[in-house]
Amino acid sequence: MKSIVFVALFGLALLAVVCSASEDAHKELLKEVVRAMVVDKTDAVQAEERECRWYLGGCSQDGDCCKHLQCHSNYEWCIWDGTSSK
């Protein structure tokens, strides 16, 4: 009888340790996801602050657009200029 109680208590203690470790792993995973979201948002902000416009970005002259793009005269957005060399 005493051994059954001991085994049951030991099993409950082991279960508590496993659940606690699982909860810690879950919290760590949540932190990683939040970090990834913050890094993506930071990259997006930096992309908006570059000095040239990407494809279909608004422009007023060819100099506003990035390499291999030109400013479309009617719609005022950057389009491919037909070149492909590096």
From Swiss-Prot:
Where is it chiefly localized? secreted
Q: State the signal peptide span.
A: 1-21
> InterPro entries, alphabetically?
Huwentoxin-1 (IPR011696), Huwentoxin_CS1 (IPR013140)
Places the protein is found: Secreted
A single Gene Ontology MF term assigned here is: toxin activity
Pfam families given for it?
Toxin_12
Q: What keywords tag this UniProt record? A: Disulfide bond, Ion channel impairing toxin, Knottin, Secreted, Signal, Toxin
Tell me which SUPFAM superfamilies the record gives: omega toxin-like
Superkingdom, natural source: Eukaryota
Which ranges are cleaved off as propeptide?
A: 22-50
Q: Can you list the disulfide-bonded cysteine pairs?
A: C52-C66, C59-C71, C65-C78
State what protein this is by name: Omega-theraphotoxin-Hhn1c
Q: Which organism is it from?
A: Cyriopagopus hainanus
Q: What is the lineage of its organism?
A: Eukaryota, Metazoa, Ecdysozoa, Arthropoda, Chelicerata
